[in-house]
């Protein structure tokens, strides 16, 4: 039995249910049904185990976490355990009554997704009518209650030109921080890659827009920026290194090293109903396999950045090369690197196909706001 340093944070994917249908969603293609979701007692136990391990942060996500009626109870439990609580939400479900309950429970931060600053573009991406006005009202409610607000803006070929507007929106909505992140091609994002891939020219324009805003705004707004891997020369340290800083809990209670880990066929993922979190973290097959550097191929073993990027993303290596145990093809040392760049350029230059919206296999009845 081994003991690894505890993760910094735990992501609780409470549900895969969501009013939105964003084509870049990082949720798996096989979405968990309501009947499969872990119950309140299971999530409370998870929080207790995380706190006992030394985890510092609990991020409540989904799907849409505000669809869980027990969310205030879970936030309150996290508070009692000394865990920092963060809500990651679409802002179109739950409304002010739920927000009041969450504030009373001790919620400490809200991250709100924004699909576009153009109302029609926002609705098209979200697959949901009137999404932007509802998000604006939710942001106002968050700030009226004194809660810190971060805007999460996901970029792709259809909205890359509107980065300045997204930053202006964050200021207007009194956010303290904005994360401007290009689509990461996992889950539904990978399925929709050809519909979402920006051109290199679009990428460079977003870099310039962020650099300009940082110079002009100084400390008045924190701006985080994430580039698309397909145009990079070096891989990013996925999740800060596999099994090192982050643990993801699926709605079913499966314990994952990252959002997309379930795409790796043949890997065994333990469930909280059957095994304790600390044991899974320290000794679970899924966490041990790619933790550290021993698993790395020879080309990575000799790289001075091996303990900086940790070989890149395992799920991306699988998706692009068919082998999760090889170096991330985004890396310029990979024999597949040129092919990755060529794929991005080819897809960005071609007409964008229609979105494949994030929908369960048996979608719930459409609401008046759902775009079909």
From Swiss-Prot:
GO biological process: pyrroloquinoline quinone biosynthetic process
NCBIfam families attached to this UniProt entry: PQQ_syn_pqqE, rSAM_more_4Fe4S
Key words, A-Z: 4Fe-4S, Iron, Iron-sulfur, Metal-binding, Oxidoreductase, PQQ biosynthesis, S-adenosyl-L-methionine
Pathway given in the UniProt record: Cofactor biosynthesis; pyrroloquinoline quinone biosynthesis
Catalytic activity: [PQQ precursor protein] + S-adenosyl-L-methionine = E-Y cross-linked-[PQQ precursor protein] + 5'-deoxyadenosine + L-methionine + H(+)
InterPro entries xref list: 4Fe4S-binding_SPASM_dom, Aldolase_TIM, PQQ_synth_PqqE_bac, PqqE-like, Radical_SAM_PqqE_MftC-like, rSAM
Cofactor: [4Fe-4S] cluster
Residues binding [4Fe-4S] cluster: 18, 22, 25
GO MF, any single term: S-adenosyl-L-methionine binding
Cofactor binding, note field: Binds 1 [4Fe-4S] cluster. The cluster is coordinated with 3 cysteines and an exchangeable S-adenosyl-L-methionine.
Organism superkingdom: Bacteria
UniProt-listed Enzyme Commission number(s): 1.21.98.4
Species this chain originates from: Xanthomonas oryzae pv. oryzae (strain KACC10331 / KXO85)
Assembly, per entry: Interacts with PqqD. The interaction is necessary for activity of PqqE.
Signal peptide (from-to): none
Domain Radical SAM core: 4-219
Record family assignment: Belongs to the radical SAM superfamily. PqqE family.
Protein name: PqqA peptide cyclase
Region entry Disordered, spans: 342-372
Purpose: Catalyzes the cross-linking of a glutamate residue and a tyrosine residue in the PqqA protein as part of the biosynthesis of pyrroloquinoline quinone (PQQ).
């Amino acid at each position: 039995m081994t003991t690894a340093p505890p993760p910094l944070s735990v992501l609780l994917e409470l549900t895969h249910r969501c009013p939105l249908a964003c084509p870049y969603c990082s949720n798996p293609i096989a979405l968990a049904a309501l009947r499969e979701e872990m119950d309140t007692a299971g999530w409370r136990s998870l929080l207790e185990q995380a706190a006992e391990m030394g985890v510092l942060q609990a991020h409540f996500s989904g799907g849409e976490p505000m669809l869980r009626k027990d969310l205030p109870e879970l936030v309150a439990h996290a508070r009692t355990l000394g865990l920092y609580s963060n809500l990651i939400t679409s802002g179109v479900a739950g409304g002010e009554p739920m927000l009041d309950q969450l504030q009373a429970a001790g919620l400490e931060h809200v991250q709100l997704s924004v699909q576009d600053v153009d109302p029609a573009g926002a609705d098209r991406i979200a697959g949901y009518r009137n999404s932007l006005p509802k998000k604006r009202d939710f942001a106002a409610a968050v700030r009226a209650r004194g809660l810190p607000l971060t805007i999460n803006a996901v970029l792709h070929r259809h909205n890359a030109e509107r980065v300045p507007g997204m930053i202006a929106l964050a200021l207007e909505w009194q956010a303290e921080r904005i994360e401007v992140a290009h689509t990461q091609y996992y889950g539904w994002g990978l399925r929709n890659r050809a519909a979402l891939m920006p051109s290199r020219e679009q990428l460079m324009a977003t870099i310039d827009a962020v650099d300009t805003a940082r110079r002009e705004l100084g400390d008045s707004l924190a701006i985080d920026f994430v580039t698309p891997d397909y145009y990079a020369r070096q891989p990013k340290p996925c999740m800060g290194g596999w099994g090192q800083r982050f643990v993801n809990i699926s709605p079913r209670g499966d314990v994952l090293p990252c959002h997309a880990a379930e795409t790796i066929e043949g890997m065994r993922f333990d469930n909280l109903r059957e095994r304790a979190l600390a044991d899974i973290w320290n000794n679970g097959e899924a966490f041990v396999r790619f933790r550290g550097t021993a698993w790395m191929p020879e080309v990575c073993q000799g790289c001075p950045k091996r303990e900086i990027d940790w070989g890149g993303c395992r799920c991306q290596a699988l998706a692009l090369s068919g082998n999760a145990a090889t170096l991330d093809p985004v890396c310029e040392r990979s024999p597949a690197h040129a092919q990755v760049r060529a794929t991005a350029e080819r897809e960005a230059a071609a007409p964008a196909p229609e979105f494949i919206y994030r929908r369960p296999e048996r979608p719930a009845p459409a609401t008046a706001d759902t775009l079909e």
